[in-house]
Regions:
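Short, small-residue-enriched loops and turns at beta-alpha junctions
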Residues: 88-92, 127-128, 170-174
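N-terminal pre-domain/capping segments
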Residues: 1-118, 141, 151, 158
Length: 195
């Protein structure tokens, strides 16, 4: 296209390619990391419960020592953790479930900062406890609920030096890129710790 320069080979060599580690064949974590390295990836998206079955991944297990262990096995395979995934419903209408989900996000943010992962990735939930699609997910009310429940998560992320990145999914509240931008603009979340 006119006006666009072609990427130089030197610049393209600097780009780090990553993979969602749960897309690699099911195997112990160390084996998955070796496969990712062999395939030429430099970083990975780590969704703890989707990737690690040989160690606990509950909130109490996300300790500094565990983070250091994971950093070492990633480094041994010349990989970084680019994104720590946390996929829970921040619009859950059950107050106890919502509180548990929020606590889990805070634990993941803290763990991401220890891992050296600058991003915690998430989806945007549903207006029901089952985390399933219904038309109300795309309502103005649902968007307000999501933004309100996201604020303390983003505030904590800012304190921990971590970015919360949302992934629009059609079945969820934020269902496309333009709505994600609208949610960001319309909220008071002007921090750079939310994308």
């Amino acid at each position: 296209m006119a006006g666009q320069e072609k990427e130089s080979p030197e610049r393209m060599e600097k780009m780090q390619l990553g993979i969602r580690l749960h897309d690699i064949k099911k195997a112990p974590l160390e084996e998955r990391l070796a496969i990712a390295h062999e395939q030429g990836f430099a970083c990975g998206h780590l969704a703890l419960a989707k990737v690690i079955s040989e160690y606990p991944v509950d909130d109490g297990a996300l300790t500094p020592g565990y983070a250091m262990y994971l950093k070492k096995i990633f480094a041994a395979n010349q990989l970084d953790v680019a994104v720590l995934g946390c996929y829970l419903n921040l619009a859950n209408p059950n107050p106890a479930s919502l509180a548990k989900n929020t606590h889990r996000y805070l634990a993941h943010i803290r763990f991401a900062s220890l891992l050296g992962a600058g991003v915690v990735g998430t989806e945007t939930g549903a207006v029901n406890e089952e985390y399933r699609f219904e038309e109300r997910n795309h309502s103005e009310e649902a968007l307000k609920i999501f933004i309100n429940n996201l604020r303390p998560v983003v505030s904590y992320a800012e304190k921990m030096g971590v970015i919360v990145a949302i992934e629009p999914v059609y079945k969820h509240i934020v269902c496309n890129p333009s709505q994600a931008e609208q949610a960001h603009v319309r909220s008071s979340l002007t921090t750079t710790h939310w994308i």
